[in-house]
C-alpha cells in the first residue's frame, strides 16, 4: 500500500510509473552494454521515449547529459564508456541504483543491496544509499547490522512473518525479544553481528 493504493496486483511498469522502483538482490543490468547505455535505456521511459528495438543515435545522445548527471550521483561517470560486464559487483549495484534513479522514484525498494560485497564495496554502496535517500523513502531488506545501523531511521524486525520490534536501531538492537529470536539468547549483543 502506497499513497492509499494497493499495488500488488499491478504489472511492474504501472507500479514504476507511480514512483515506486525496486532493486533485487541479484544485480540486473545489461552486461554487454556500456554503463551510459544502461542508464539511457532507463531514461527512455521517463523522457517519454518508450523502449523500442531501434532508436537513432542522435535521439539516444540527447539523453547523455542526464545520464551523466545520474552517473555522477553514483560515482560512475568515469566508467560511462565501460562495458558493464567488466565492472566489479559493487559498481554494478551502483549502476542499478542509477537506473532506478532515472525514473525519479518517490519510493525505492532495495533487497539486500550489499549482499555478497567486499568491505570496500559495502562502504561505497552504503554511502550511496544515504545520498540517494535524501528526499525519498527507501525501504530496504538488509541483514548486515553495520549497514542497517548507519542508514536506517526506523528498523522493523520480522520473525516468522510477524513484526517482532520496530523503532530506532539502538532500541531494536537492545530488544530482548529480537536478541532471543536471532541470537538464541537475550544476553548477546546484536551490534557486532554484521556479516
Regions found by a protein language model. Name each.
Residues 1-195:
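Glycine-rich phosphate-binding loops of nucleotide-dependent enzymes
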Amino acid at each position: 500500500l502506497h499513497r492509499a493504493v494497493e499495488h500488488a496486483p499491478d504489472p511492474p511498469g504501472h507500479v514504476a510509473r507511480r514512483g515506486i522502483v525496486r532493486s533485487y538482490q541479484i544485480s540486473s543490468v545489461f552486461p554487454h552494454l556500456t554503463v551510459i547505455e544502461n542508464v539511457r535505456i532507463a531514461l527512455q521511459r521517463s523522457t517519454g521515449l518508450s523502449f523500442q528495438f531501434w532508436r537513432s543515435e542522435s535521439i539516444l545522445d540527447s539523453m547523455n547529459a542526464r545520464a551523466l548527471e545520474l552517473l555522477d550521483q553514483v560515482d560512475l561517470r568515469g566508467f560511462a564508456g565501460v562495458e558493464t560486464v567488466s565492472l566489479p559487483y559493487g559498481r554494478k549495484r551502483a549502476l542499478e541504483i542509477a537506473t532506478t534513479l532515472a525514473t525519479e522514484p518517490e519510493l525505492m525498494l532495495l533487497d539486500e543491496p550489499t549482499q555478497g560485497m567486499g568491505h570496500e564495496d559495502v562502504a561505497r554502496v552504503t554511502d550511496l544509499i544515504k545520498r540517494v535517500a535524501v528526499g525519498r523513502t527507501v525501504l530496504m531488506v538488509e541483514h548486515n547490522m553495520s549497514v542497517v545501523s548507519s542508514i536506517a531511521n526506523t528498523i522493523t524486525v520480522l520473525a516468522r512473518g510477524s513484526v517482532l520490534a520496530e523503532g530506532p536501531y539502538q532500541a531494536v538492537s537492545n530488544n530482548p525479544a529480537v536478541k532471543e529470536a536471532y541470537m538464541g539468547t537475550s544476553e548477546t549483543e546484536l551490534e557486532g553481528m554484521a556479516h
